[in-house]
Amino acid sequence: MKAITLVGSTGSIGTQTLDIVTQYPDQFRIVGLAAGNNVEMLAAQIRQFRPKIAAICSEDKLPALKEAIIDLDPQPILLAGEAGVIEVARYGDAQTVVTGIVGCAGLLPTIAAIEAGKDIALANKETLIAGAPVVLPLVEKHGVKLLPADSEHSAIFQCLQGVPKSGLRKILLTASGGAFRDWDVERLADVTVADALKHPNWSMGRKITVDSATLMNKGLEVIEAHFLFGLDYDNIEIVIHPQSIIHSLIELQDTSVLAQLGWPDMRLPLLYALSWPDRIYTDWERLDLVKAGNLTFREPDHQKYPCMQLAYAVGKAGGSMPAVLNAANEQAVALFLDEKIRFLDIPRCIEWVCDRHQNDNRANPSLDDILAADKWARQEVLTATEKLETPSRIISLR
């Protein structure tokens, strides 16, 4: 039985991971849980899965959490704040830590888990995008496994099983196109938050659903794929695949193309990250190609999705620039969700901030450099919002 700690237990990734644990009680057990601020849900999870340790990031919610499980015996260790989440990530006998926290907030818990010798089921792409210069050397130093748990990188990882490293020629990341794949560019000026949250295929959290609408999600995945699989950016391609049945593809040196297919269900990549190298029988709906029907593909519209181009440029710039891109995107999306900026302001804010970082880009950033760049970028987005009257795009990193 594999012991698991789950960081980000009340979010979309967390609840789907716990669904897997519920279905396979002989395969997996929960050692630790950490969540953001949802006391009621975390308390219910503690009651059901009986972890040895749990943490809530919002320190003011700790008394309420203690009260909610006061009758439990034995009591788990209860912690709060960022330090508490980090302690959960490194705690005890967990073999694998699932990182389901949204955004760069997952970086420090992931580092703590790696340093404690835990394998990582990586569902938090921002950790690697911002922190790869620190995270990857630590993975090698401590001899842990870094297993992708999001659909696209899991698909690539699955396709690569048995393929020699020298055999990989190209990666093709599929994208649904998000909420606006069939909209004319001119309509994007009138996008509402409700519009952006209507993903056609996947059930995800609010932030990642907006990222899908801007295609920043796919741009970030390009950077993640570069770090995970070692390909140059010119050999990583995005293709729009509206049905979300093919989760990604690889092209080999002899022009053979391998793909991983399945219904759009995040539990599949999560289960594989937890069970690898084994395959566990499930009773989930099996893919019926006749039912799926036509599988279509098209090139992404670069005018509609400027965030995609930004991500490629930032990835090639390297250093601390990806941390700035990620933080600026998180801040801009948060402002959009709070209806403080418009949808089209998201890429403009990000581009403005990345441009201002070019002269300060650190080629080999330390953890302190990355955290400082993250903090700086979030503040700069607020400055950028004051300059949004300029009608044209502000800068070009290319």
Swiss-Prot record:
Keywords from the named record: Isoprene biosynthesis, Manganese, Metal-binding, NADP, Oxidoreductase
Gene3D superfamilies per record: 1.10.1740.10, NAD(P)-binding Rossmann-like Domain (3.40.50.720)
UniProt: NADPH binding residues: 10-13, 36, 38, 124, 126, 205
Gene Ontology MF terms: 1-deoxy-D-xylulose-5-phosphate reductoisomerase activity; manganese ion binding; NADPH binding
Reported cofactor(s): Mg(2+); Mn(2+)
Tree of life domain: Bacteria
GO biological process, one term: isopentenyl diphosphate biosynthetic process, methylerythritol 4-phosphate pathway involved in terpenoid biosynthetic process
Assigned EC number: 1.1.1.267
Binding site for Mn(2+): 150, 152, 221
Pathway this chain belongs to: Isoprenoid biosynthesis; isopentenyl diphosphate biosynthesis via DXP pathway; isopentenyl diphosphate from 1-deoxy-D-xylulose 5-phosphate: step 1/6
Enzyme class: oxidoreductase
Described purpose of this protein according to its UniProt entry: Catalyzes the NADPH-dependent rearrangement and reduction of 1-deoxy-D-xylulose-5-phosphate (DXP) to 2-C-methyl-D-erythritol 4-phosphate (MEP).
Name listed for the protein in its UniProt record: 1-deoxy-D-xylulose 5-phosphate reductoisomerase
Organism of this sequence: Nostoc punctiforme (strain ATCC 29133 / PCC 73102)
Gene name per UniProt: dxr
